[in-house]
From Swiss-Prot:
The active site is at D203 (proton donor). Gene3D superfamilies: Nucleoside phosphorylase domain. PROSITE patterns: PNP_UDP_1. This is Purine nucleoside phosphorylase DeoD-type.
């Protein structure tokens, strides 16, 4: 057991999906995994392990933001030796050619979080996805005929930010805004593990188009299937 995850070591697979919402973790386990059992309920952050096409897979809620996901992925790697971590989450588009429900593969992320500047003594470390995971996910998405976008995302430290620089970020090619990828990629690099963020556009910051909270919790199956297929091909 770790501080925030109440599982025994053998109860968590070495490949894991990471939704922010614990109810989405429950949905993934019940919808896609066979024989899924719940290994964690600490703080209501649900975690499950089951099989997908004969491969053992876990899914763990992480909460929102850099501090929360950092706790869970650190404990998953440090205490449970998880090797492959794939975030499945939502993001807000800031490019006109990125549409609601498009799937984004985050190649890298920039951030206004101070996490890496504190870690690297002021250096602007550039967190990146694992290339094997990124390439595999892209190929799977194309096989499925999905509207995939590959590029940079922005990991925001604040959800409600009156001084957001979204227009400038868009000019520099950033596709969308979310709140966790920088932490995932940085910590995966620290521990020598594979990581990827597979994101569904839940709303468009420029146009105001959005999905409902219920849709964000229980849909976006294409993203989940891409993540699961990517995990089992590793």
């Amino acid at each position: 057991m770790s501080v925030h995850i109440g599982a025994k070591e053998h109860e968590i697979a070495d490949k894991i999906l990471l939704p922010g919402d614990p109810l989405r973790a429950k949905y993934i386990a019940e919808t896609f995994l066979e024989g899924a059992t719940c290994y964690n309920q600490v703080r209501g952050m649900l975690g499950f392990t089951g099989t997908y096409k004969g491969h053992r897979i876990s899914v763990q809620g992480t909460g929102m933001g850099v501090p929360s996901i950092s706790i869970y992925i650190t404990e998953l790697m440090q205490s449970y030796n998880v090797q492959t971590l794939i975030r499945v989450g939502t993001c807000g588009a800031i490019q006109k050619d990125v549409k609601v429900r498009d799937v984004i593969l985050a190649m890298t992320s920039s951030t206004d979080s101070q996490m890496n500047r504190m870690t690297f003594g002021g250096i602007d470390y550039a967190p990146t996805a694992n290339f094997d995971l990124l390439k595999t996910a892209y190929e799977i998405g194309k096989e499925k005929g999905l509207q995939l976008k590959v590029g940079s995302v922005f990991t925001a430290d604040m959800f409600y930010n009156e001084n957001a620089q979204f227009e400038k970020l868009a000019r520099y090619g950033v596709l969308a805004v979310e709140m966790e990828t920088t932490a995932l990629y940085t910590l995966a690099a620290k521990f020598g593990r594979k990581a990827l963020s597979v994101l569904t556009v839940s709303d468009h910051i420029l146009t105001g188009e959005e999905t409902t909270a219920e849709e964000r919790q229980t849909t976006f199956n294409e993203m989940i299937e891409v993540a699961l297929e990517t995990a089992i091909r590793q």
